[in-house]
């Protein structure tokens, strides 16, 4: 029986066909996903676009999370015990703006300029035009800069007052009528944040909040110069800066205040030039042109734009499944980061691909622990979903059983090395990661006499996570063979394995079993694929 897929309710949004711009106005601004589509980020800070409304989660920090226990009605051996959970942090990006006592509402037009990395929002308050240009600096890790321009010719009083809002309250109700994915985590009933210190001086305001289980402290600060004008200017331009910093082993406030001070001293115009220059260099290496198809070119460019905004570039985190746009999938990193995202950067921005591999290598000890938890006596098993390195999946059959994640990471490593010629990553932990992850295949697979002594891998889940715990998933077996072959080559060269282990790896790769269905003349997804109704 075919599974009905629920209608997500999304409609086409008229964003225009300019290859460099996305524009929304009119009814398009009312659609629920506009705030996601117009999100900004720099790999550390993620800022949702306009449309969510006041008090809604708005700002996220890549790699910052809280640890929360996973509750099972009946747990079993190998089940993850806790999850990493991305939470929205304090919001230092949205000042109070009012004209003649009327607070500014939602924008009438928003424009995302992918050439410059700037989002422009246009408002009308009592017939007076207001424009806010905003950027999340690609050159300054935690910095957000905004320029507010107001036509004051008909205004008697303009008030611009920066503020820092506390982290929003968590979602406290679970509506099964609109939740179709069993892997969605249950809601939190109370805030996970512990408020530390609040700061307010003549120059800045802010706060420091702490997540007790993970140990993260997060500082959010904003410039605080409050501007009040009483009809003495025809045009007003005013810049506001915000900065974020996070740490697990110190006080982030000093770092945030330093970043804020440096941004203030540079000024918005200078930061806008920095941003434009950064993207000019990026597009020189990454730009895709599709002649005579501006909408297609726009779509491809937008995908590239969001990738580079979402990926961490310092090796301390990676790229979440939903990027920096929200809390979807709890902010977890999945295997799509290695198989789909990293190759893009390997051929366009190899330093970013390298940083993604550095993060994976740093997780090797956690992957070894995960393998022991899953009952393997040797090797390393990377988690299906994680932020900090431990398995966070509470959906064991479709999650932890996806052993192919090891081969996906090996594919990413090989792609990077062959695309760039940079073999130093192998000496810096890449070769060890490759070998340790390959050893898992020799643990869970075996040469099966029933299949002509071919090497089989049973009771695993492939990319089709709705067909869980199958024998000889085609994708898994093909990827495992390539993984084993490469690990034998690199492991021998690095003297991490002996000849006997290399022979075992190569034999398994050569004799990997691939389920071919003679009746249909095609390879099956797994051994039991054609027996399903």
Task: Set out the residue ranges of the language-model regions.
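Short, mixed-charge aromatic SLiMs
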Residues: 70, 168-176, 326-331, 362-370, ...
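Alpha-helical scaffold segments in carbohydrate-active enzymes
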Residues: 302-309, 359-366, 432-444, 482, ...
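Acidic/polar, glycine-enriched structural segments that form the non-catalytic walls/loops
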Residues: 2-40, 45-50, 54-329
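Beta-strand segments within the central parallel beta-sheet cores of soluble alpha/beta enzyme folds
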Residues: 131-132, 161-163, 318, 355-359, ...
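The feature captures the catalytic groove of carbohydrate-active enzymes
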Residues: 325-333, 380-428, 436-507
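Substrate-binding groove/exosite segments of carbohydrate-active enzymes
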Residues: 47, 270-418, 533
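C-terminal capping/lid segments that line or modulate ligand- or cofactor-binding pockets
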Residues: 28-72, 340, 389, 401-402, ...
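Active-site core of glycosidic bond-cleaving carbohydrate-active enzymes
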Residues: 333-362, 428, 485, 489-533
């Amino acid at each position: 029986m075919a599974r009905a897929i629920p209608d997500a309710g999304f409609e086409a949004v008229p964003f225009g066909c300019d290859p460099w711009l996305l524009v929304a106005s009119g009814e398009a601004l009312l659609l629920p996903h506009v705030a996601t589509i117009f999100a900004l980020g720099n790999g550390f800070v993620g800022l949702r676009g306009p449309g969510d409304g006041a008090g809604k989660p708005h700002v996220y920090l890549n790699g910052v999370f809280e640890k929360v226990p996973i509750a099972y009605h009946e747990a079993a051996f190998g089940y993850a015990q806790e999850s990493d959970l991305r939470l929205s942090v304090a919001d230092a990006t949205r000042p109070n703006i009012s004209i003649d006592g009327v607070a500014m509402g939602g924008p009438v037009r928003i424009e995302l300029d992918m050439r410059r990395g700037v989002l422009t929002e246009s408002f009308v308050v009592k017939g007076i035009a207001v424009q806010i240009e905003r950027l999340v600096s690609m050159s300054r890790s935690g910095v957000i800069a905004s320029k507010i321009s107001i036509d004051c010719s008909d205004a008697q009083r303009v008030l611009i007052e920066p503020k820092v809002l506390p982290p929003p309250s968590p979602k406290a109700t679970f509506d099964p009528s609109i939740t179709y994915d069993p892997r969605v985590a249950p809601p939190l009933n109370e805030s996970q944040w512990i408020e530390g210190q609040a700061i307010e001086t003549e120059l800045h305001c802010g706060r420091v909040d702490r997540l007790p289980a993970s140990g993260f402290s997060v500082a959010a600060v904003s410039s605080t110069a409050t501007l009040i004008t009483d009809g003495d200017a025809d045009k007003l331009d005013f810049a506001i800066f915000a900065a974020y910093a996070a740490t697990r082993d110190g006080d982030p406030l000093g770092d945030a205040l330093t970043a804020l001070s440096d941004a203030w001293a540079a000024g918005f115009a200078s930061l806008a030039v920095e941003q434009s220059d950064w993207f000019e260099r990026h597009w020189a290496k990454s730009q895709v042109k599709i002649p005579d198809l501006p909408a297609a070119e726009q779509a491809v460019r937008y995908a590239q734009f969001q990738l580079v905004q979402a990926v961490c570039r310092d090796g301390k985190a990676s790229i979440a499944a939903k990027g920096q746009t929200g809390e979807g999938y709890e902010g977890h990193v999945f295997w799509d980061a290695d198989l789909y995202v990293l190759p893009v950067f390997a051929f366009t921005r190899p330093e970013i691909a390298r940083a993604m591999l550095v993060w994976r290598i740093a997780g090797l000890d956690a992957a070894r622990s995960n393998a022991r938890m899953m009952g393997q006596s040797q090797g390393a098993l990377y988690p299906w979903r994680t932020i900090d390195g431990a398995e966070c999946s509470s959906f064991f059959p479709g999650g932890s059983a996806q052993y192919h994640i090891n081969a996906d990471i090996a594919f990413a490593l090989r792609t990077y090395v062959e695309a760039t010629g940079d073999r130093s990553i192998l000496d810096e932990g890449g070769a060890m990661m490759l070998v340790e992850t390959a050893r898992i295949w020799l643990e869970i697979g075996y040469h099966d006499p029933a299949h002509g002594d071919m090497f089989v891998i049973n009771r695993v889940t492939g990319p089709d996570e709705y067909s869980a715990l199958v024998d000889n998933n085609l994708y898994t077996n093909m990827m495992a063979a390539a993984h084993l072959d490469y690990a034998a080559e690199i492991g021998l060269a690095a003297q991490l394995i002996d000849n006997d282990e290399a022979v075992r790896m190569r034999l398994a790769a050569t004799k990997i079993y691939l389920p071919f269905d003679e009746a249909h003349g095609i390879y099956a997804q797994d051994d039991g694929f054609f027996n399903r109704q």
